[in-house]
Amino acid sequence: MRALSFDVTIPRYLLARSLGRFTELATFGPLGGLRMTEVPEPALPAEDWVGLRVISAGICGTDLATLSFTAATSLEPFGSFPAVPGHEILARIEEVGPAVRDLEVGMRVVVDPLLSCRVRGHPDEEHCPSCRTGRPGTCEMAGEDGTTRVGARPLSRGLTIGYHADLPGGWGPFMVAHRSQIFPVPDELDDRSAVLVEPLSIGMHAALNAPPEPGQDVLVIGSGPIALGTIWALRASGFQGTLISQAKRDHEARLARALGAGEVVAPGDEARQALVDTGAQAYQPIVGEEVYAGGGFPLIYDCVGSPSSLSQSLRFAAPRGRIVMLGCAAMIPKLDLTFVWARELELRGFVGYGLERWRGREEHTFQITQELLVETRAPVRDLVTHVFPLDQFRTALSAAANHRRSEAVKVVLEP
């Protein structure tokens, strides 16, 4: 089948690192690691797997960082290449393994891309502590080959579909997934809403596990899909307090308000004024950025993960405040951590999704997200601003990477 394939080599890494700042030819172009090529159409590895025809798949910030070789190498041991990218997946079932009793050919589904111990083929008694508690995002076996057989060999190492040599992602026409990864899409959700279930579930996972306390003011930093999804998730899961969104551009501010932000501020003076309105007093050190005492935000969701956003989060947080990191922060040079101890702050990161406690039952984040999308009828489909056929992938990646110019929020590929 014709699909996009990404490979990691030292020459491509060096080329992208040296020229990527100047030209996309070295990242998303023909000199980069991504190309359209023939790859084997995947067969079902076992009886409890399903075959899928991809309807659409999103492009996320992690994809852009990986393809441009700007992502930290810390997670490199937990992937395998060459790989067909794409982990935000909407698909239709093409084939059902004989051990799968509750799915049918033709169903629209979304795919949890995380590769749990169950997907790797390990028996229940050998599942790692994370997978036993329904948190495959931190699977402790991701760096090892599995026992599931793909052809004549064991399943390669890897944490997720899209960064895995044996399991193609959504940037190709066909893929396979284990039954535990499959979630049927309600008829009430159109395709553009459904393809967002994966990124929306990241914000939902954080909102359910690090929710605001009654009466707390919340600041959400960022205006991409994760930040906007977090705003929606907070409101959809029941938060009714003050929710301030920090967004740079008018179209992002409109989306933030539509999804539940009570106030939207721009970075800089407007954000500073929102902080002062909490009772914060500004002080100017001999050198460096302005700092504050008193007031502050008791809960900040940093959905950017950049040096400037993390610095702001640390300065804007109230004493004993919580900072939730959803922005895939990696190598941050010269970050002043003084206020972590001087304000007794709590920093907590979240990755992916999994089993949650919800309305008196245990449910997967994807199920909760779809349930609440139907209930709230929120205009999340408006986050999908650009849709491209797969063969226009270079244009699509450029639009996603240059979102200030293109006004892209979520860019989607259709094989």
Task: Please give the residue ranges for each predicted region.
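Glycine-rich beta-strand-centered segment in the early N-terminal region that forms part
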Residues: 40-57, 72-133, 137, 186-188
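ADP-ribose/adenylate-binding Rossmann-like module
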Residues: 315-333, 347
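Short N-terminal strand-loop motif that marks the start
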Residues: 1-88, 108, 169, 173, ...
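C-terminal hydrophobic helical "lid"/dimerization subdomain
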Residues: 3, 16, 288, 311-314, ...
